[in-house]
Amino acid sequence: MASVSSKIFAITGGASGIGAATCRLLAKRGAATLCVGDLCSENMKQLENDIKEINPNTKVHCTVLDVSSSSNVDEWIKDIITTFGDLHGAANIAGIAQGAGLRQAPTILEEDDQQWKKVFQVNLDGVLYSTRAQVRAMKESSSTNPGDRSIVNVASIASMSHMPDVFAYGTSKAGCAYFTTCVSQDVMPFGIRANTVSPEEVEETYKKEGFSVIEADDVARTIVWLLSEDSRPVFGANINVGACMP
């Protein structure tokens, strides 16, 4: 079983879907604290109740978080360090999708500027802001409390499939994967690992928009493994879940 016992984790997009599944599994496996950041507060109370039922010893700290704001992300991570004193791992799962098969060809003509920017602000800028703040906190904490630390960024199998559609989504997720691999080489000397998970699409919303789907728990197991000590030799990987790489 992947070891995450007694550790502190930050999860963006953690109140629903893959993020909530990751939180539940981390609690089941003994995580000390889960710091959840999500733009939508609707599911936070339910998540807190779920975690309490799974493991009453796991603390849950929920924050309304806009990952497209670097200052918002920086304050969130600073608050985690101030409140809990450390950060052992992070999963950056917050993201937004585009509907596939909804536009007439050539679909590039309907890829408008506003939609492009919105998708990139969350799916790529948000990953940059979150990863940067987490690395800063982990580097500072590891100087006084050394140990293996891990960051997992969630991209998508769509980043590899070269679909003639959803250009902003696929391109932003490809950027996420490339960025994470580069960061992994940068931070490994400081005892920080960075990896990517690229799942097939998850949940009914995406199914209605033309994607095949897998369960959130399937993706969560891979994320938690990468956050755990069991994956210590692994860094710079991009692991596909639920579908073969094209």
Swiss-Prot record:
InterPro entries: NAD(P)-bd_dom_sf, SDR_fam. NADP(+) binds at residues 18, 66, 132, 169, 173. The active site is at 169 (proton donor), 173 (lowers pka of active site tyr). The keyword Signal applies. It catalyses: chanoclavine-I + NAD(+) = chanoclavine-I aldehyde + NADH + H(+). Its EC number is 1.1.1.332. One of its GO terms (molecular function) is oxidoreductase activity, acting on the CH-OH group of donors, NAD or NADP as acceptor. Keywords: Alkaloid metabolism, NADP, Oxidoreductase, Signal. SUPFAM superfamilies: NAD(P)-binding Rossmann-fold domains. Residues 1-20 form the signal peptide. PANTHER family: DEHYDROGENASES, SHORT CHAIN, ESTRADIOL 17-BETA-DEHYDROGENASE 8-RELATED. Chanoclavine-I dehydrogenase; part of the gene cluster that mediates the biosynthesis of fungal ergot alkaloid. DmaW catalyzes the first step of ergot alkaloid biosynthesis by condensing dimethylallyl diphosphate (DMAP) and tryptophan to form 4-dimethylallyl-L-tryptophan. The second step is catalyzed by the methyltransferase easF that methylates 4-dimethylallyl-L-tryptophan in the presence of S-adenosyl-L-methionine, resulting in the formation of 4-dimethylallyl-L-abrine. This is Chanoclavine-I dehydrogenase easD. The gene is easD.
